[in-house]
C-alpha cells in the first residue's frame, strides 16, 4: 500500500481534482490510501465563519455559509455532469454536511460564544466536504473507492485545536479500518487534519496537519511510500520569494527535511517526518501539475551524500538574553531557566550559552511577558525584537572542513547576534536583523550554491 496526500491547491477546482483523480488512477496497482486537505482557501473560509458566529454577526455567517455551499455544489455539478445519479447523490451529501454545519454556527451565533470544541468541529468541515466530493468523482471515473471517516481512526489527545496523536490507538485502528474499507475496492479516501479523542469528541491536528495525518497513516499501515502532492516540483534549496536561482533537490535525508521544515521551509509540515522515520518509509514531494516530474525523495540518511542542501530562515523571531553571575559554578541554573519556558509553554529554537549568559530565540508570535517576569526574579533579562534566524542545513555540514568559513565569509558586513550548531551536525544557525534577512539569504545562497569556488576571505 501507499499513501497519497493531496494538498488544498492540488484539489482546488475542477482541473485540479480531475488531475488528482487521474494521478490516483495510475497507481491502483499500489493500493493507494488517499488523504486530502480541504479545497484551497476553504479552511480560511471556515475560520471566518467561526469568527463571525462568535461575534454574533448572523448576516455575515449566512453569506459565508452560502459561499461555502455554493462552491462545493457547483464543483460537484461540474465534475459529475456526465453522471447524473452520482451527481444527485453527491449534492445531497454536500447539502447534508452544510446543513449540519449551518445548524451549529447559527447556535454559536445566537449565544455569541465559540468554544474550542465547536471551533474544531467547524473548521474540520473542509476536509469532510473535499473528501466526499473527490470520492464521488473517483467512483464516477471507474475507480471503486470507499470513504473512511478519519475521526474513527485518528485518535488524539483531548486538545480540540491541537490534538496530539495517540500513536498506540492509531496503530491499532488504522490498519483495521483501511482493510475493511478496501474490501472489493480499488482505493480508499480519508481526511487529513481531523481526528477525535478517545471519547469520540472531534479534534484537529492544527494548521498544516494533513501532511502529519498522511505520515501517521503511512506508519500505521507500513506503507511502501508516502506521496505528498503539492503545487511545486519538490523541495528547493531556498525560498524562491527571497532567492531567484534556487535549485530543486532530488533527494534529502529525513534529518535534513525535518530541519528544513522546522526552520521555515513551507513544503512540509514540521511534524510530518517523524512517523515516517520510525518505519523508514520514504516520502516523495511531488507536483500535481507536473505528475511526471521527479520531485524530491526524502530517504534515510545513509542514502544521502554529505553537504549543504538548503538555506532556510524564520523571519520573525526575538532573542531573549538572560544574564546572571549566579550561573557560574551553580548546578541547576539552566534547569530552572528552561522549566520557566516549559511551564509557560514558550517554545525555544536556538540556544547559546556562556559562563554567565544564556541566549535563546523564540517565535515573535509567542507571548513571553510572564516568562520574562519570572526570569527577571533571579537574572537580568534583555529582549531583542525584530530579528530573523537563518539556518544552513545539510548532512554532516558541521563536520565538513571550512564549513563555518564558507557560511560566514559572505556576511562580513552583517551583524550576527548568536550562532548555534545543531548536535545532529545537520544545521548551522545564526541570528540577524530582520531588515537584513533578504540580503543575507540571497548572498549566502549565492556563495554556497551558485559560486562555491569564489569565496571571499575573512
Regions found by a protein language model. Give the residues of each.
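Nucleotide/pyrophosphate-binding catalytic subdomain
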Residues: 1-268, 273, 432-433, 452, ...
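Glycine-rich beta-alpha junction loops
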Residues: 39-40, 152, 232-234, 283, ...
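Short hydrophobic alpha-helical runs that function as membrane-insertion/retention elements
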Residues: 225-229, 283-285, 349-350
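Surface-exposed amphipathic alpha-helical tracts and adjacent flexible/coil segments at the periphery
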Residues: 268, 279, 289-296
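A conserved regulatory-domain signal marking ACT and ACT-like small-molecule sensing domains
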Residues: 292-458
Amino acid at each position: 500500500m501507499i499513501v497519497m496526500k493531496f494538498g488544498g491547491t492540488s484539489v482546488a477546482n475542477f482541473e485540479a481534482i480531475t488531475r488528482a483523480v487521474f494521478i490516483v488512477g495510475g497507481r491502483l496497482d499500489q493500493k493507494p490510501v488517499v488523504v486530502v486537505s480541504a479545497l484551497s482557501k476553504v479552511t480560511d473560509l471556515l475560520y471566518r465563519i467561526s469568527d463571525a458566529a462568535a461575534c454574533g454577526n448572523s448576516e455575515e455567517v449566512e453569506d459565508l455559509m452560502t459561499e461555502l455551499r455554493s462552491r462545493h455544489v457547483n464543483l460537484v455539478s461540474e465534475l459529475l455532469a456526465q453522471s447524473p445519479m452520482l451527481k444527485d447523490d453527491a449534492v445531497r451529501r454536500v447539502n447534508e454536511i452544510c446543513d449540519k454545519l449551518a445548524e451549529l454556527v447559527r447556535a454559536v451565533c445566537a449565544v455569541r460564544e465559540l468554544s474550542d470544541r465547536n471551533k474544531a468541529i467547524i473548521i474540520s468541515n473542509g476536509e469532510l466536504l473535499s473528501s466526499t466530493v473527490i470520492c464521488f468523482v473517483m467512483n464516477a471515473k471507474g475507480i471503486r473507492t470507499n470513504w473512511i471517516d478519519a475521526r474513527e481512526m485518528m485518535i488524539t489527545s483531548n486538545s480540540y485545536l491541537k490534538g496530539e496523536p495517540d500513536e498506540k490507538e492509531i496503530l491499532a485502528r488504522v490498519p483495521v479500518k483501511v482493510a475493511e474499507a478496501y474490501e472489493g475496492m480499488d482505493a480508499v479516501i480519508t481526511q487529513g487534519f481531523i481526528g477525535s479523542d478517545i471519547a469520540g469528541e472531534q479534534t484537529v491536528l492544527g494548521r498544516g496537519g494533513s501532511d502529519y495525518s498522511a505520515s501517521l497513516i503511512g506508519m500505521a499501515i507500513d506503507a511502501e511510500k508516502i506521496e505528498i502532492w503539492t503545487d511545486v516540483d519538490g523541495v528547493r534549496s531556498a525560498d524562491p520569494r527571497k532567492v531567484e536561482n534556487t535549485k530543486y533537490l532530488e533527494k534529502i535525508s529525513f534529518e535534513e527535511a525535518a530541519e528544513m521544515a522546522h526552520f521555515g521551509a513551507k513544503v512540509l509540515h514540521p511534524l510530518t517526518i517523524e512517523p515516517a522515520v520510525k518505519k523508514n518509509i520514504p516520502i516523495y514531494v511531488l507536483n500535481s501539475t507536473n505528475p511526471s516530474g521527479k520531485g524530491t525523495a526524502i530517504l534515510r540518511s545513509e542514502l544521502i551524500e554529505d553537504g549543504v542542501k538548503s538555506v532556510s530562515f524564520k523571519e520573525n523571531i526575538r532573542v531573549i538574553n538572560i544574564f546572571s553571575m549566579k550561573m557560574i559554578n551553580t548546578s541547576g541554573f539552566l534547569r530552572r531557566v528552561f522549566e520557566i519556558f516549559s511551564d509557560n509553554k514558550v517554545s525555544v529554537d536556538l540556544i547559546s550559552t556562556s559562563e554567565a549568559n544564556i541566549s535563546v530565540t523564540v517565535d515573535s508570535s509567542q507571548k513571553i511577558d510572564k516568562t520574562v517576569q519570572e526570569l527577571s526574579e533571579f537574572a537580568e533579562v534583555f529582549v531583542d525584537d525584530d530579528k530573523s534566524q537563518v539556518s544552513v542545513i545539510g548532512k554532516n555540514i558541521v563536520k565538513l572542513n571550512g564549513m563555518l568559513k564558507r557560511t560566514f565569509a559572505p556576511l562580513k558586513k552583517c551583524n550576527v547576534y548568536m550562532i548555534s550548531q545543531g548536535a545532529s551536525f545537520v544545521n548551522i544557525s545564526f541570528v540577524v536583523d530582520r531588515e537584513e534577512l533578504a540580503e543575507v539569504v540571497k548572498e549566502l545562497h549565492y556563495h554556497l550554491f551558485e559560486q562555491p569556488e569564489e569565496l571571499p576571505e575573512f
